[in-house]
C-alpha cells in the first residue's frame, strides 16, 4: 500500500507537466523565485561559499522587479532622454556632414574595391 501511495504522487505531476507545456514555462519563473528563497533559507552558510553562483541569478531578480517600476519611471525620464537625443541629433548632423566628405574619398577607393 505504501508503494502505491508513493507511486501515485510521482505519476501525478508527470502527466500534469506533459499536458501543460506552457504552464511549465510559467512555472519556471515562479520556480526561480522560490528557488532563491529556498536556497537562501536552506543554505545560509553555503551562501558565502558559492559566491559566484548566486550573483549570476541575482541580477535576474532585480531585472524582473525593475521592469514593473521602470515603466512609470520611463515616462518621467522620457523628457530627459529627449533633451539628450536632441543634443545627440545636432551633433550627428555635424558628423554626417563630415562623413559626406569621407564618403567622397571612399568612393574613389570604392571603385578600386569593385
From Swiss-Prot:
One of its GO terms (molecular function) is zinc ion binding. It holds the Pfam family TP2. Its main location: nucleus. Changing residue 108 to A: No effect on phosphorylation. Disulfide bonds: none annotated. Changing residue 29 to A: 50% loss of zinc binding and loss of nucleolar localization. One of its GO terms (biological process) is penetration of zona pellucida. A motif (Nuclear localization signal) lies at residues 87-95. One of its GO terms (cellular component) is male germ cell nucleus. InterPro entries: TP2. The modification Phosphothreonine is found at residue 101. Residues 1-114 are annotated as: Disordered. Residues 90-114 have a biased composition (Basic residues). Zn(2+) binds at residues 12, 14, 16, 24, 29, 31, 35, 38. The modification Phosphoserine is found at residue 109. Plays a key role in the replacement of histones to protamine in the elongating spermatids of mammals. In condensing spermatids, loaded onto the nucleosomes, where it promotes the recruitment and processing of protamines, which are responsible for histone eviction. This is Nuclear transition protein 2. It comes from Rattus norvegicus. The lineage of its organism: Eukaryota, Metazoa, Chordata, Craniata, Vertebrata. The gene is Tnp2.
Amino acid at each position: 500500500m505504501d508503494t502505491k501511495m508513493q507511486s501515485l504522487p510521482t505519476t501525478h505531476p508527470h502527466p500534469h507537466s506533459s499536458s501543460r507545456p506552457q504552464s511549465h514555462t510559467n512555472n519556471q519563473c515562479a520556480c526561480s523565485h522560490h528557488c532563491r528563497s529556498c536556497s537562501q533559507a536552506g543554505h545560509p552558510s553555503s551562501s558565502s561559499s558559492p559566491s559566484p553562483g548566486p550573483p549570476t541569478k541575482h541580477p535576474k531578480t532585480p531585472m524582473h522587479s525593475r521592469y514593473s517600476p521602470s515603466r512609470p519611471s520611463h515616462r518621467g525620464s522620457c523628457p530627459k532622454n529627449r533633451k539628450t537625443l536632441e543634443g545627440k541629433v545636432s551633433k550627428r548632423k555635424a558628423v554626417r556632414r563630415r562623413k559626406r566628405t569621407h564618403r567622397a574619398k571612399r568612393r574613389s577607393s570604392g571603385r578600386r574595391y569593385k
